[in-house]
Each structure stands twice: as C-alpha cells, then as structure tokens.
A protein has these predicted regions:
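Alpha-helical interface subdomain recognition
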Residues: 1-127
Length: 127
C-alpha cells in the first residue's frame, strides 16, 4: 500500500517515488519487515527442534521486535499516504491501534527485555 502510493502521489511536481527520503522510508520498512519475518522463522524452527522452553529467549525477542516493527511501518505508511492514511479507506489507523495493543498483550516490552537481558547475561556466567 505504501509503495503503491509513492507511485501515485505527487508533491512539488514530482512523484513521491522520486524523493530519496521516501525511498529510504520504503527501504527501511522492507528491511524491518524481513528482519522480523526471519526472526519469527528462526524461533519457529527452534521451537520445533528444541521445544518452547529452549526457545524462550528468541520468543521474547519476537514479542519485542514484531509489534514495534509493525508500529513503525504502519506509521511510515500513514505518513506517506497523508490524510488518506488515517481515513476509513485504508484501515491503517485501525491497524496502528491493534499493533500498539499487541505491545502490551503479553506483557509490556520492558518485561520481555528484562527477562531477555537477564537470560543473556546469565548465559555468560552466574548472575
């Protein structure tokens, strides 16, 4: 939706897709989506092979990374779409609210970061 809109929307006589900062926002979004996707696949693989208990650190990483990524990408899409981004035609405002809620659904990010940090430090010696 965001990338398609860059080909349609114009400012100062140029398509959005011609602006380097817009291309950068699209590129960053693509990278963040792929990072979260690969982390999720890695976690699923670890869960399948070793079980959920052994995968708890990577599961915590996903619970931190995925909702945060979704918020950032949706926010960029809203920004690029302008007023249309918060209108009823795109549902982006609704998705933004859902993504924000997901950051709290299984405990706030800080809880996951605390536990993950503790686990990582413990793996290097007694805490």
């Amino acid at each position: 939706l965001m990338s398609k809109r860059t080909l349609e929307r114009e400012a100062f006589g140029k398509k959005f897709s011609d602006f380097s900062n817009i291309r950068q926002e699209v590129a960053i979004s693509k990278c963040e989506i792929e990072q979260a996707r690969l982390l999720t696949l890695s976690a699923a693989d670890k869960m399948d092979k070793l079980g959920n208990k052994e995968a708890k650190d990577i599961i915590a990483m996903i619970k931190i990374v995925a909702p945060d990524m979704a918020l950032k990408v949706i926010d960029r899409a809203i920004q690029i779409l302008g007023g249309k981004g918060v209108g009823p035609d795109t549902h982006l405002a609704h998705y933004f609210a859902i993504a924000r809620m997901l950051r709290l659904a299984d405990g706030p990010d800080e809880v996951h970061m605390y536990q993950l940090g503790k686990s990582v430090i413990r793996s290097y010696g007694k805490l």
